[in-house]
């Protein structure tokens, strides 16, 4: 078995790590950074950019630069959260044929897992470059409060990226791994408060140690899969837009270019206000009207930002209360509070957490890297490299089926340790019913329609009988990834129907395979593009060197030879404008052939230059030697100016 890497696929940033010896190690990407912006750009020439290169061009290409795609993964277009995002995102979120929220890029519909796969491919390549070997297996983290559809979609993204996803684990649990494996001894109860770019989770975890083996048992989890740093940014953006409109009378909401510049500046301002009391958003030429260009110059204080996001911070407190109640613990029974996610760097967030728990959160866990490091530890456990760690995670939401009267009947309660299996016997609602529809739901509400529909299937061939007589055994089986498998069996006939819940909004196997093929084709295109760029660079270098040699050769180069070389240079310059590597290389070869006489002259001149230097050096040695002989035994004596 090869190395299993750990990937934190974040809303704002992503990170990849491996276990190096006994310690998890974050791997730097090609740009030298330890985290990679989860930004994907589709350029006019067909190139796909990921990370910083995508972020750098976002201002000039806002409609085709995609970010916070994790907020769409596994979601329906009609979802309330998606409808909110449609109003604020610069790119086009559209309804797919299966009801999913997809993105339209240059007239092409892309699924959220397909887009996220580009980030995963970057993480995969980062690990491969570091390890010097192919990587095919990974542990990928998800928010603890992700539902079944979102977990499935994340696994699909891994498959599209060419990864066998060995395990999906919850982000707070992964962070607890990173903290607990080397930093603590004995039994401890911890709370992991995870406020990232797009999601919020709270998990209460018990770490127990016996005979050198550590057990991480998740006691409860709660959260909000649509609350994070992006929402904080949007509050600040809206404030800046309103202030600018008040001052200048221009509404920037209709200007995508201005909004993209504003998004970058708002994010920077928010980060600066974590360490400073005041900052300035200064954007020259943000827009223009009939009177000329307009500039934005707005001061923002920390207290102003805090007033804008106060309700968002408060929104994280209720899940804390629920998680503690579900775990059967009081605040005083917790030993440590761990902060995860970039948004927890905000002093207001840290104070809210400290006030609620009555103790300061620990500062020795890197909020941006802990999740990937924990995933790497889990990867090492699965690969058999690490044996002294056991993880007992939970399902975040209750699972059940719709029964008579549109009621959700729960089979597996939320916060049940996984993997788990539960069966229950149901019957028919009507006389002589020959088939039943099993409608699988996830959520905490009693009314079936108020919960998340995960999918449905039919069990047919039931022997006609009075209602209530047939016995249909429904079994729910949740695997270690938190993904649900359901079966229904007629106990009389033995007929059985099994499915892995493929949410009605999920990708089919055929669609995933198509996207895998497209990803592979893109990889081939990327390689082709890289080779074209290399050919162009070599050609540019050759043109530069040739022109320099022509200048140095001067009159030694016959006019007809110079004309021949000039023509070859022109032909190569024309070839550089094409997209054809073979043409560039052919014209490059022609220039080298045409420049043979020039190279001979350059060689002769170099030899003459060398001989001249050698002669000068020999003369200097002789003179130097004589001078040296004159002063070997002399005393130091000051030389007067008038004797010079």
From Swiss-Prot:
Induction: By stress conditions e.g. heat shock.
Matching Pfam families: HSP70
In-chain residues carrying the UniProt-annotated modification Phosphothreonine: 199
Low complexity composition bias: residue spans: 602-625
GO molecular function: ATP binding; ATP-dependent protein folding chaperone; unfolded protein binding
InterPro entries (UniProt xref): ATPase_NBD (IPR043129), Chaperone_DnaK (IPR012725), Heat_shock_70_CS (IPR018181), HSP70_C_sf (IPR029048), HSP70_peptide-bd_sf (IPR029047), Hsp_70_fam (IPR013126)
Region Disordered, annotated ranges: 601-644
Role summary: Acts as a chaperone.
Protein name (database record): Chaperone protein DnaK
Source organism per UniProt: Tolumonas auensis (strain DSM 9187 / NBRC 110442 / TA 4)
Organism lineage string: Bacteria, Pseudomonadati, Pseudomonadota, Gammaproteobacteria, Aeromonadales
Gene this chain is encoded by: dnaK
